[in-house]
A protein has these predicted regions:
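Non-heme Fe(II)/2-oxoglutarate
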Residues: 1-75, 181-220
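Catalytic core of non-heme Fe(II) oxygenases with the double-stranded beta-helix
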Residues: 67-186
């Protein structure tokens, strides 16, 4: 799991929200499958709406410049975002996201929620992750922050009591399907950068380990 503070700059966040004010929306259940469709209640921007391309451009630019996104998650591909609004009474009950998504389809290893509304402007709407061996984790971040978590985790969005929850959701295929390998690669990348900035330290040995680990396990 990874928190990305200030993924979106204030001007980007303002433009996204202005576009969302004017957008065309579909019933959110149209993008859900199986059990998820029966527990989902929200509105999502239609991919047929012409200006959705501008929303994609803004988020794409933010992801491209975000170093932790690249170095920790090792994305090989990711889906276009779903931009969603939740009003009072809306929720998304416990579910697991689909294995494949996007067009063309990609394997969905990591789910990422980008928060677009200040948390003080709505009550409820927390993202809850249900872990088998640890307590439920509740996430409600400032606008512009993002949170990435394993797609195979049971999670839900609690009912909105007042105000409006706005989010963008992206699904990511990682070069490293195994989350343990992905974490080791990210740790070694940090070690290499630390060695580069430490006087009288040779980064080559650990860089060699990193390169060989990537070579052995990298995939799509």
């Amino acid at each position: 799991m990874l928190t990305l503070p200030d993924l979106l700059l204030p001007p980007e966040l303002a433009e996204i929200n202005a576009l969302m004010d004017a957008a065309e929306y579909d019933d959110g259940r149209a993008s859900a499958r199986g059990i998820a469709a029966g527990v989902k209640s929200n509105r999502q921007i239609s991919r047929r709406w012409p200006k959705v391309a501008r929303l994609d451009e803004i988020l794409e630019a933010a992801l491209r410049r975000c170093r932790p996104f690249r170095e920790v998650l090792s994305p090989s591909a990711y889906t276009p975002a779903l931009f969603a609004r939740y009003f009072p009474g809306d929720a998304y009950g416990p579910h697991v996201d689909a294995v494949m998504g996007g067009n063309p389809p990609i394997r969905q290893d990591i789910s990422m929620t980008v928060f677009l509304a200040p948390p003080e402007t709505y009550q409820g709407g927390e993202l809850c992750l249900h872990h088998q061996a640890s307590p439920t984790q509740t996430i409600k971040l400032p606008a512009g922050h993002a949170f990435a978590y394993p797609t195979n985790c049971v999670h839900e969005v609690l009912p909105i009591q007042s105000g409006e929850r706005r989010v963008a959701v992206v699904w990511i295929q990682s070069f490293f399907r195994d989350p343990d390998i992905r974490e080791m690669v990210a740790d070694l990348r940090r070690c290499v950068e630390s060695a580069k900035s430490t006087p009288n330290t040779d980064p080559l040995p650990i860089s060699k380990v990193l390169n060989n680990l990537e070579r052995k396990f990298i995939g799509t």
